[in-house]
Curated annotation (Swiss-Prot):
Record function comment: Disorganizes the host nucleoid and inhibits replication, but without host DNA cleavage or degradation. Only the architecture of the nucleoid is affected. May act on the host chromosomal sequences that determine the structure of the nucleoid. Binds to dsDNA but not to ssDNA.
Gene, per the UniProt record: ndd
Gene Ontology biological process: symbiont-mediated perturbation of host cell cycle progression; symbiont-mediated suppression of host DNA replication
Domain of life, source organism: Viruses
GO function term, MF aspect, one: DNA binding
Pfam families for this protein: Phage_T4_Ndd
Spans traversing the lipid bilayer: none
Organism: Escherichia phage RB69
Classification via InterPro entries: Phage_Ndd
Stated name of the protein: Nucleoid disruption protein
Keywords annotated in UniProt: DNA-binding, Host-virus interaction, Inhibition of host DNA replication by virus, Modulation of host cell cycle by virus
Amino acid sequence: MKYMTVTDLNNAGATVIGTIKGGEWFLGTPHKDILSKPGFYFLVSKLDGRPFSNPCVSARFYVGNQRSKQGFSAVLSHIRQRRSQLARTIANNNMVYTVFYLPASKMKPLTTGFGKGQLALAFTRNHHSEYQTLEEMNRMLADNFKFVLQAY
């Protein structure tokens, strides 16, 4: 099993939405419409632009449809409140993390299509069904990749 990298995220079509430090937005806050989207949010440390730098993904979070439309802002609130060991680590380690967003509709290369070539990926069943949850996709990510700050 390998660590997920920025290259994996870019190949799946993830977009950078901002940077955080200690559970707070660093260098500007993205618009609420961006933060309330359901999908997966990945934290990457040390995204410094060096030509051969391919940093590993530190952590992943998923956000479903919410009536309150808090989205990733709720995750940041949990980090600031230090509600888990992961949240305490992110809040206290004084590192800047780049936040990548990937909607569930683009998860196929990282879940059921992981490790397959372009042709095989085209014929791989789509992982998304009305009965499949973001939790199941999260477990598939854990089956395919390791994350620096998360054991599962």
